[in-house]
Amino acid sequence: MAKEKFERTKPHVNIGTIGHVDHGKTTLTAAITTILAKEGKAKAFNYEEIDKAPEEKERGITINTAHVEYETENRHYAHVDCPGHADYVKNMITGAAQMDGAILVVSAADGPMPQTREHILLASRVGVEYIVVFLNKADQVDDPELIDLVEMEVRELLNEYGFPGDDTPIVVGSALKALQNPDDAEAIKPIKDLMAEVDAYIPTPERPTDKAFLMPIEDVFTITGRGTVATGRVETGTLKVGDEVEIVGMKDEITKVVVTGVEMFRKILDSALAGDNIGALLRGVQREDIERGQVLAKPGSITPHNKFVGQVYVLKKEEGGRHTPFFNGYRPQFYFRTTDVTGSIQLPDGVEMVMPGDHIDMTVELITKVAMGDNLRFAIREGGRTVGSGVVTSIIE
Protein backbone atom coordinates (compact mmCIF):
# COMPACT_ATOMS: atom_id res chain seq x y z
CA MET A 1 0.00 0.00 0.00
CA ALA A 2 1.30 3.45 -0.93
CA LYS A 3 2.30 5.75 1.90
CA GLU A 4 -0.24 8.40 2.74
CA LYS A 5 0.92 11.84 1.73
CA PHE A 6 0.89 14.45 4.49
CA GLU A 7 -1.75 16.90 3.24
CA ARG A 8 -0.75 20.37 4.36
CA THR A 9 -4.22 21.85 4.06
CA LYS A 10 -4.62 23.22 7.58
CA PRO A 11 -2.21 25.46 9.49
CA HIS A 12 0.06 23.50 11.84
CA VAL A 13 0.46 24.33 15.55
CA ASN A 14 2.64 22.65 18.22
CA ILE A 15 1.14 22.37 21.69
CA GLY A 16 1.61 20.34 24.85
CA THR A 17 0.03 19.56 28.20
CA ILE A 18 1.80 20.98 31.27
CA GLY A 19 0.99 20.96 34.99
CA HIS A 20 1.51 19.17 38.31
CA VAL A 21 2.00 15.41 38.51
CA ASP A 22 -1.28 13.44 38.71
CA HIS A 23 -3.48 16.41 37.82
CA GLY A 24 -4.55 14.57 34.66
CA LYS A 25 -2.34 15.72 31.76
CA THR A 26 -2.08 12.28 30.18
CA THR A 27 -5.76 11.44 30.75
CA LEU A 28 -6.69 14.72 29.05
CA THR A 29 -4.37 13.96 26.11
CA ALA A 30 -6.03 10.53 25.74
CA ALA A 31 -9.50 12.12 25.97
CA ILE A 32 -8.72 14.69 23.25
CA THR A 33 -7.52 12.00 20.80
CA THR A 34 -10.42 9.66 21.64
CA ILE A 35 -13.09 12.30 21.11
CA LEU A 36 -11.55 13.72 17.93
CA ALA A 37 -11.10 10.15 16.62
CA LYS A 38 -14.90 9.80 16.72
CA GLU A 39 -15.02 12.61 14.14
CA GLY A 40 -12.25 11.05 12.05
CA LYS A 41 -9.80 13.80 13.04
CA ALA A 42 -7.33 11.74 15.09
CA LYS A 43 -6.09 8.29 15.96
CA ALA A 44 -7.33 7.41 19.45
CA PHE A 45 -4.62 6.79 22.05
CA ASN A 46 -5.34 5.27 25.44
CA TYR A 47 -3.70 6.31 28.69
CA GLU A 48 -1.14 3.48 28.69
CA GLU A 49 0.08 4.21 25.15
CA ILE A 50 0.80 7.84 26.06
CA ASP A 51 2.16 7.07 29.53
CA LYS A 52 4.84 4.66 28.32
CA ALA A 53 6.46 7.39 26.26
CA PRO A 54 9.61 6.25 24.46
CA GLU A 55 13.00 7.62 25.48
CA GLU A 56 14.51 10.14 23.11
CA LYS A 57 17.94 11.66 22.97
CA GLU A 58 18.11 15.41 22.44
CA ARG A 59 21.63 16.90 22.62
CA GLY A 60 22.72 13.86 24.60
CA ILE A 61 19.96 14.24 27.17
CA THR A 62 17.47 11.42 27.67
CA ILE A 63 13.89 12.66 27.61
CA ASN A 64 10.67 10.66 27.70
CA THR A 65 8.06 12.31 25.51
CA ALA A 66 4.81 11.12 23.97
CA HIS A 67 3.85 12.70 20.64
CA VAL A 68 0.28 12.54 19.36
CA GLU A 69 -1.30 14.38 16.47
CA TYR A 70 -4.85 15.37 15.73
CA GLU A 71 -6.95 17.86 13.83
CA THR A 72 -9.76 20.25 14.64
CA GLU A 73 -11.98 21.91 12.02
CA ASN A 74 -9.37 24.62 11.52
CA ARG A 75 -5.98 23.19 12.36
CA HIS A 76 -3.52 20.33 12.51
CA TYR A 77 -1.89 19.87 15.94
CA ALA A 78 1.21 18.08 17.16
CA HIS A 79 0.83 17.55 20.92
CA VAL A 80 3.51 16.53 23.42
CA ASP A 81 2.92 15.00 26.84
CA CYS A 82 5.69 14.00 29.25
CA PRO A 83 5.34 11.35 31.96
CA GLY A 84 7.75 12.88 34.47
CA HIS A 85 8.39 16.36 35.82
CA ALA A 86 12.12 16.18 34.96
CA ASP A 87 11.13 15.42 31.35
CA TYR A 88 9.23 18.71 31.15
CA VAL A 89 12.18 20.67 32.50
CA LYS A 90 14.54 19.07 29.96
CA ASN A 91 12.05 19.37 27.10
CA MET A 92 11.37 23.03 27.63
CA ILE A 93 14.99 24.06 28.19
CA THR A 94 16.47 22.05 25.29
CA GLY A 95 13.64 23.06 22.97
CA ALA A 96 13.23 19.38 22.05
CA ALA A 97 9.51 20.01 21.94
CA GLN A 98 8.97 23.56 20.72
CA MET A 99 5.53 24.65 21.89
CA ASP A 100 3.54 27.46 20.29
CA GLY A 101 1.11 27.23 23.18
CA ALA A 102 0.31 25.00 26.15
CA ILE A 103 -2.69 23.48 27.90
CA LEU A 104 -2.14 23.90 31.65
CA VAL A 105 -3.95 21.13 33.53
CA VAL A 106 -4.89 21.93 37.14
CA SER A 107 -6.89 19.63 39.41
CA ALA A 108 -9.99 21.49 40.60
CA ALA A 109 -9.84 19.29 43.71
CA ASP A 110 -6.26 20.27 44.67
CA GLY A 111 -5.72 23.67 43.08
CA PRO A 112 -2.30 24.90 41.90
CA MET A 113 0.66 22.90 43.26
CA PRO A 114 4.47 23.43 43.16
CA GLN A 115 4.93 22.01 39.66
CA THR A 116 1.99 24.08 38.40
CA ARG A 117 4.00 27.15 39.35
CA GLU A 118 7.26 25.71 38.00
CA HIS A 119 5.76 24.85 34.61
CA ILE A 120 4.23 28.34 34.27
CA LEU A 121 7.62 29.85 35.14
CA LEU A 122 9.40 27.61 32.62
CA ALA A 123 6.84 28.45 29.93
CA SER A 124 7.41 32.16 30.50
CA ARG A 125 11.20 31.70 30.40
CA VAL A 126 11.40 29.67 27.21
CA GLY A 127 8.99 31.77 25.19
CA VAL A 128 5.71 29.80 25.33
CA GLU A 129 3.44 32.85 25.13
CA TYR A 130 -0.03 31.32 25.17
CA ILE A 131 -1.61 29.13 27.85
CA VAL A 132 -5.16 27.74 27.96
CA VAL A 133 -6.25 26.22 31.29
CA PHE A 134 -8.21 23.01 31.86
CA LEU A 135 -9.54 22.67 35.42
CA ASN A 136 -9.73 18.90 35.64
CA LYS A 137 -11.43 16.50 38.08
CA ALA A 138 -14.38 18.89 38.48
CA ASP A 139 -16.58 15.85 39.20
CA GLN A 140 -14.71 15.44 42.51
CA VAL A 141 -15.71 18.91 43.72
CA ASP A 142 -19.22 19.35 45.15
CA ASP A 143 -19.08 23.06 45.91
CA PRO A 144 -19.02 25.31 42.80
CA GLU A 145 -17.53 28.10 44.93
CA LEU A 146 -14.40 25.97 45.41
CA ILE A 147 -13.98 25.78 41.64
CA ASP A 148 -14.30 29.58 41.41
CA LEU A 149 -11.62 29.87 44.09
CA VAL A 150 -9.20 27.58 42.22
CA GLU A 151 -9.86 29.53 39.03
CA MET A 152 -8.96 32.78 40.80
CA GLU A 153 -5.75 31.23 42.16
CA VAL A 154 -4.72 30.04 38.70
CA ARG A 155 -5.38 33.48 37.17
CA GLU A 156 -3.28 35.14 39.88
CA LEU A 157 -0.45 32.67 39.31
CA LEU A 158 -0.49 33.36 35.56
CA ASN A 159 -0.44 37.12 36.20
CA GLU A 160 2.53 36.67 38.52
CA TYR A 161 4.65 35.23 35.68
CA GLY A 162 3.67 37.78 33.04
CA PHE A 163 0.77 35.93 31.40
CA PRO A 164 -2.58 37.73 30.92
CA GLY A 165 -4.28 35.74 33.70
CA ASP A 166 -7.53 37.72 33.58
CA ASP A 167 -8.00 37.03 29.85
CA THR A 168 -6.78 33.42 29.82
CA PRO A 169 -9.48 30.94 28.76
CA ILE A 170 -10.31 28.45 31.54
CA VAL A 171 -12.43 25.37 30.83
CA VAL A 172 -13.84 23.23 33.66
CA GLY A 173 -14.44 19.50 33.24
CA SER A 174 -13.39 15.92 33.86
CA ALA A 175 -10.97 14.31 31.41
CA LEU A 176 -11.63 10.85 32.86
CA LYS A 177 -15.42 11.14 32.44
CA ALA A 178 -14.95 12.24 28.85
CA LEU A 179 -12.51 9.41 28.16
CA GLN A 180 -14.84 6.80 29.68
CA ASN A 181 -18.00 8.14 27.98
CA PRO A 182 -16.93 9.36 24.54
CA ASP A 183 -20.53 9.12 23.25
CA ASP A 184 -22.06 11.15 26.08
CA ALA A 185 -22.55 14.68 24.74
CA GLU A 186 -22.50 16.24 28.20
CA ALA A 187 -19.32 14.41 29.31
CA ILE A 188 -17.35 15.39 26.21
CA LYS A 189 -18.58 19.01 26.02
CA PRO A 190 -15.67 20.37 28.15
CA ILE A 191 -13.14 18.69 25.83
CA LYS A 192 -14.82 20.17 22.75
CA ASP A 193 -14.97 23.57 24.48
CA LEU A 194 -11.28 23.27 25.37
CA MET A 195 -10.25 22.57 21.77
CA ALA A 196 -12.41 25.48 20.56
CA GLU A 197 -10.56 27.76 23.01
CA VAL A 198 -7.17 26.39 21.91
CA ASP A 199 -8.16 27.01 18.26
CA ALA A 200 -9.24 30.57 18.99
CA TYR A 201 -6.72 31.68 21.62
CA ILE A 202 -3.37 30.23 20.48
CA PRO A 203 -2.40 32.08 17.29
CA THR A 204 -1.00 30.28 14.26
CA PRO A 205 2.79 30.69 14.55
CA GLU A 206 4.72 32.68 12.00
CA ARG A 207 6.23 30.24 9.52
CA PRO A 208 10.05 30.07 9.51
CA THR A 209 10.11 31.43 5.94
CA ASP A 210 8.24 34.59 7.04
CA LYS A 211 10.87 35.49 9.64
CA ALA A 212 14.08 37.49 9.02
CA PHE A 213 16.81 35.64 7.10
CA LEU A 214 19.38 33.84 9.28
CA MET A 215 21.98 31.23 8.36
CA PRO A 216 24.59 29.92 10.84
CA ILE A 217 27.89 29.54 8.97
CA GLU A 218 29.24 25.99 9.04
CA ASP A 219 32.11 26.23 6.58
CA VAL A 220 33.92 28.81 4.44
CA PHE A 221 35.99 28.36 1.30
CA THR A 222 37.35 30.39 -1.60
CA ILE A 223 36.51 29.93 -5.27
CA THR A 224 39.39 31.42 -7.26
CA GLY A 225 38.23 34.33 -9.37
CA ARG A 226 34.73 34.36 -7.87
CA GLY A 227 35.11 35.04 -4.17
CA THR A 228 34.31 33.54 -0.80
CA VAL A 229 31.51 31.03 -0.18
CA ALA A 230 29.83 30.49 3.20
CA THR A 231 27.87 27.27 3.61
CA GLY A 232 25.17 26.31 6.12
CA ARG A 233 21.52 25.53 6.65
CA VAL A 234 19.09 28.44 6.40
CA GLU A 235 17.41 28.62 9.82
CA THR A 236 14.76 31.25 9.06
CA GLY A 237 13.65 33.48 6.21
CA THR A 238 14.61 33.52 2.54
CA LEU A 239 17.70 34.63 0.62
CA LYS A 240 17.86 35.89 -2.97
CA VAL A 241 20.80 36.70 -5.22
CA GLY A 242 21.54 40.41 -4.85
CA ASP A 243 20.38 40.58 -1.20
CA GLU A 244 22.49 42.50 1.27
CA VAL A 245 23.30 40.53 4.45
CA GLU A 246 25.34 41.11 7.59
CA ILE A 247 28.08 38.85 8.96
CA VAL A 248 27.46 38.82 12.72
CA GLY A 249 29.33 37.31 15.68
CA MET A 250 32.85 36.38 16.83
CA LYS A 251 33.94 40.01 16.28
CA ASP A 252 32.82 43.35 17.66
CA GLU A 253 32.04 44.87 14.28
CA ILE A 254 29.34 43.77 11.85
CA THR A 255 30.25 43.51 8.14
CA LYS A 256 27.69 44.16 5.38
CA VAL A 257 28.05 42.15 2.15
CA VAL A 258 26.10 41.45 -1.02
CA VAL A 259 25.20 37.86 -1.96
CA THR A 260 26.23 37.35 -5.59
CA GLY A 261 25.24 33.70 -5.89
CA VAL A 262 23.24 30.98 -4.11
CA GLU A 263 23.90 27.29 -4.73
CA MET A 264 22.36 24.10 -3.40
CA PHE A 265 23.89 20.69 -4.23
CA ARG A 266 25.98 22.41 -6.95
CA LYS A 267 22.83 23.77 -8.60
CA ILE A 268 22.28 27.49 -8.91
CA LEU A 269 19.18 28.84 -7.13
CA ASP A 270 17.35 32.14 -7.49
CA SER A 271 16.45 32.00 -3.83
CA ALA A 272 16.86 29.79 -0.76
CA LEU A 273 14.26 29.05 1.94
CA ALA A 274 14.38 28.09 5.62
CA GLY A 275 15.56 24.45 5.80
CA ASP A 276 17.76 24.57 2.68
CA ASN A 277 21.45 23.65 2.88
CA ILE A 278 23.19 26.22 0.72
CA GLY A 279 26.41 27.92 -0.26
CA ALA A 280 26.24 31.72 -0.47
CA LEU A 281 28.80 33.52 -2.63
CA LEU A 282 29.76 36.80 -0.96
CA ARG A 283 31.16 39.80 -2.83
CA GLY A 284 34.39 41.41 -1.63
CA VAL A 285 34.91 39.28 1.48
CA GLN A 286 38.33 37.84 2.28
CA ARG A 287 38.54 34.24 3.47
CA GLU A 288 39.99 35.40 6.81
CA ASP A 289 37.16 37.89 7.44
CA ILE A 290 34.56 35.18 7.94
CA GLU A 291 34.49 32.00 10.04
CA ARG A 292 32.38 29.15 11.33
CA GLY A 293 30.30 30.30 14.30
CA GLN A 294 29.24 33.56 12.69
CA VAL A 295 25.85 33.98 11.06
CA LEU A 296 24.65 35.59 7.86
CA ALA A 297 21.57 37.64 8.68
CA LYS A 298 19.16 40.22 7.34
CA PRO A 299 20.66 43.64 8.16
CA GLY A 300 19.54 44.91 11.56
CA SER A 301 17.82 41.67 12.60
CA ILE A 302 20.38 40.28 15.07
CA THR A 303 23.28 41.68 17.12
CA PRO A 304 26.37 40.15 18.77
CA HIS A 305 26.53 39.87 22.57
CA ASN A 306 28.81 38.30 25.16
CA LYS A 307 26.88 38.65 28.43
CA PHE A 308 23.48 37.11 29.08
CA VAL A 309 21.28 35.30 31.58
CA GLY A 310 20.40 31.70 30.75
CA GLN A 311 18.16 29.03 32.23
CA VAL A 312 20.26 25.85 32.31
CA TYR A 313 19.61 22.15 32.93
CA VAL A 314 22.73 20.36 34.19
CA LEU A 315 23.03 16.75 33.06
CA LYS A 316 23.12 13.97 35.61
CA LYS A 317 26.02 11.53 35.77
CA GLU A 318 23.79 8.83 34.19
CA GLU A 319 23.18 11.15 31.24
CA GLY A 320 26.90 11.47 30.60
CA GLY A 321 27.19 14.69 32.57
CA ARG A 322 29.52 15.72 35.38
CA HIS A 323 29.93 13.53 38.44
CA THR A 324 30.63 16.53 40.68
CA PRO A 325 29.06 19.95 41.27
CA PHE A 326 30.44 23.19 39.82
CA PHE A 327 30.85 26.59 41.45
CA ASN A 328 30.94 30.31 40.66
CA GLY A 329 33.54 31.15 38.04
CA TYR A 330 33.23 27.74 36.31
CA ARG A 331 34.61 28.13 32.75
CA PRO A 332 33.22 25.60 30.28
CA GLN A 333 32.54 25.98 26.54
CA PHE A 334 29.16 27.27 25.39
CA TYR A 335 28.08 25.75 22.09
CA PHE A 336 25.90 28.13 20.03
CA ARG A 337 24.58 26.86 16.67
CA THR A 338 27.88 25.77 15.08
CA THR A 339 30.70 26.63 17.47
CA ASP A 340 32.09 26.49 21.01
CA VAL A 341 32.92 29.73 22.86
CA THR A 342 34.54 29.77 26.31
CA GLY A 343 32.62 31.62 28.99
CA SER A 344 32.55 32.02 32.75
CA ILE A 345 29.44 31.71 34.89
CA GLN A 346 28.09 33.64 37.82
CA LEU A 347 25.52 31.89 40.00
CA PRO A 348 22.55 33.70 41.59
CA ASP A 349 23.09 35.26 45.04
CA GLY A 350 22.94 32.66 47.77
CA VAL A 351 23.65 29.73 45.44
CA GLU A 352 26.98 28.14 46.35
CA MET A 353 27.13 25.35 43.80
CA VAL A 354 25.18 23.51 41.13
CA MET A 355 24.67 19.74 41.30
CA PRO A 356 24.22 17.40 38.32
CA GLY A 357 20.44 17.17 37.67
CA ASP A 358 19.71 20.76 38.82
CA HIS A 359 18.18 23.47 36.70
CA ILE A 360 19.16 27.04 37.43
CA ASP A 361 19.46 30.62 36.18
CA MET A 362 23.01 31.77 35.58
CA THR A 363 24.77 34.84 34.19
CA VAL A 364 27.31 33.98 31.50
CA GLU A 365 30.15 36.10 30.14
CA LEU A 366 31.68 34.82 26.89
CA ILE A 367 35.22 35.65 25.72
CA THR A 368 33.90 36.57 22.23
CA LYS A 369 30.57 37.91 21.03
CA VAL A 370 27.98 35.59 19.52
CA ALA A 371 24.95 36.57 17.41
CA MET A 372 22.07 36.03 19.80
CA GLY A 373 18.49 36.86 20.69
CA ASP A 374 16.12 35.71 23.43
CA ASN A 375 15.21 32.00 23.43
CA LEU A 376 18.42 30.97 21.63
CA ARG A 377 19.37 27.44 22.72
CA PHE A 378 22.90 26.43 23.66
CA ALA A 379 24.78 23.45 25.08
CA ILE A 380 27.44 23.58 27.79
CA ARG A 381 30.41 21.37 26.99
CA GLU A 382 33.60 20.24 28.65
CA GLY A 383 36.22 18.62 26.48
CA GLY A 384 33.69 17.91 23.75
CA ARG A 385 31.04 16.24 25.90
CA THR A 386 27.75 17.92 26.77
CA VAL A 387 27.31 18.64 30.48
CA GLY A 388 24.37 21.04 30.31
CA SER A 389 21.71 22.52 28.09
CA GLY A 390 20.36 26.04 28.23
CA VAL A 391 18.27 28.81 26.74
CA VAL A 392 19.03 32.55 26.67
CA THR A 393 16.37 34.28 28.78
CA SER A 394 17.73 37.84 28.69
CA ILE A 395 20.66 39.69 27.16
CA ILE A 396 22.77 41.96 29.37
CA GLU A 397 25.31 43.40 26.91
From Swiss-Prot:
<feature type="region of interest" description="G3">
    <location>
        <begin position="81"/>
        <end position="84"/>
    </location>
</feature>
<dbReference type="InterPro" id="IPR004160">
    <property type="entry name" value="Transl_elong_EFTu/EF1A_C"/>
</dbReference>
<keyword id="KW-0547">Nucleotide-binding</keyword>
<feature type="region of interest" description="G4">
    <location>
        <begin position="136"/>
        <end position="139"/>
    </location>
</feature>
<dbReference type="InterPro" id="IPR050055">
    <property type="entry name" value="EF-Tu_GTPase"/>
</dbReference>
<dbReference type="InterPro" id="IPR031157">
    <property type="entry name" value="G_TR_CS"/>
</dbReference>
<feature type="binding site">
    <location>
        <begin position="136"/>
        <end position="139"/>
    </location>
    <ligand>
        <name>GTP</name>
    </ligand>
</feature>
<dbReference type="InterPro" id="IPR009000">
    <property type="entry name" value="Transl_B-barrel_sf"/>
</dbReference>
<dbReference type="InterPro" id="IPR009001">
    <property type="entry name" value="Transl_elong_EF1A/Init_IF2_C"/>
</dbReference>
<dbReference type="GO" id="GO:0003746">
    <property type="term" value="F:translation elongation factor activity"/>
</dbReference>
<dbReference type="InterPro" id="IPR000795">
    <property type="entry name" value="T_Tr_GTP-bd_dom"/>
</dbReference>
<dbReference type="Pfam" id="PF03144">
    <property type="entry name" value="GTP_EFTU_D2"/>
</dbReference>
<feature type="binding site">
    <location>
        <begin position="19"/>
        <end position="26"/>
    </location>
    <ligand>
        <name>GTP</name>
    </ligand>
</feature>
<dbReference type="InterPro" id="IPR041709">
    <property type="entry name" value="EF-Tu_GTP-bd"/>
</dbReference>
<feature type="region of interest" description="G2">
    <location>
        <begin position="60"/>
        <end position="64"/>
    </location>
</feature>
<dbReference type="InterPro" id="IPR005225">
    <property type="entry name" value="Small_GTP-bd"/>
</dbReference>
<dbReference type="GO" id="GO:0005829">
    <property type="term" value="C:cytosol"/>
</dbReference>
<feature type="binding site">
    <location>
        <begin position="81"/>
        <end position="85"/>
    </location>
    <ligand>
        <name>GTP</name>
    </ligand>
</feature>
<dbReference type="GO" id="GO:0003924">
    <property type="term" value="F:GTPase activity"/>
</dbReference>
<keyword id="KW-0963">Cytoplasm</keyword>
<keyword id="KW-0342">GTP-binding</keyword>
<feature type="region of interest" description="G1">
    <location>
        <begin position="19"/>
        <end position="26"/>
    </location>
</feature>
<comment type="similarity">
    <text>Belongs to the TRAFAC class translation factor GTPase superfamily. Classic translation factor GTPase family. EF-Tu/EF-1A subfamily.</text>
</comment>
<keyword id="KW-0251">Elongation factor</keyword>
<keyword id="KW-0378">Hydrolase</keyword>
<dbReference type="Pfam" id="PF03143">
    <property type="entry name" value="GTP_EFTU_D3"/>
</dbReference>
<feature type="domain" description="tr-type G">
    <location>
        <begin position="10"/>
        <end position="206"/>
    </location>
</feature>
<keyword id="KW-0648">Protein biosynthesis</keyword>
<dbReference type="InterPro" id="IPR004161">
    <property type="entry name" value="EFTu-like_2"/>
</dbReference>
<dbReference type="GO" id="GO:0005525">
    <property type="term" value="F:GTP binding"/>
</dbReference>
<dbReference type="Pfam" id="PF00009">
    <property type="entry name" value="GTP_EFTU"/>
</dbReference>
<keyword id="KW-0479">Metal-binding</keyword>
<comment type="function">
    <text>GTP hydrolase that promotes the GTP-dependent binding of aminoacyl-tRNA to the A-site of ribosomes during protein biosynthesis.</text>
</comment>
<dbReference type="InterPro" id="IPR004541">
    <property type="entry name" value="Transl_elong_EFTu/EF1A_bac/org"/>
</dbReference>
<comment type="subunit">
    <text>Monomer.</text>
</comment>
<feature type="region of interest" description="G5">
    <location>
        <begin position="174"/>
        <end position="176"/>
    </location>
</feature>
<dbReference type="InterPro" id="IPR027417">
    <property type="entry name" value="P-loop_NTPase"/>
</dbReference>
<protein>
    <recommendedName>
        <fullName>Elongation factor Tu</fullName>
        <ecNumber>3.6.5.3</ecNumber>
    </recommendedName>
</protein>
<feature type="binding site">
    <location>
        <position position="26"/>
    </location>
    <ligand>
        <name>Mg(2+)</name>
    </ligand>
</feature>
<keyword id="KW-0460">Magnesium</keyword>
<dbReference type="InterPro" id="IPR033720">
    <property type="entry name" value="EFTU_2"/>
</dbReference>
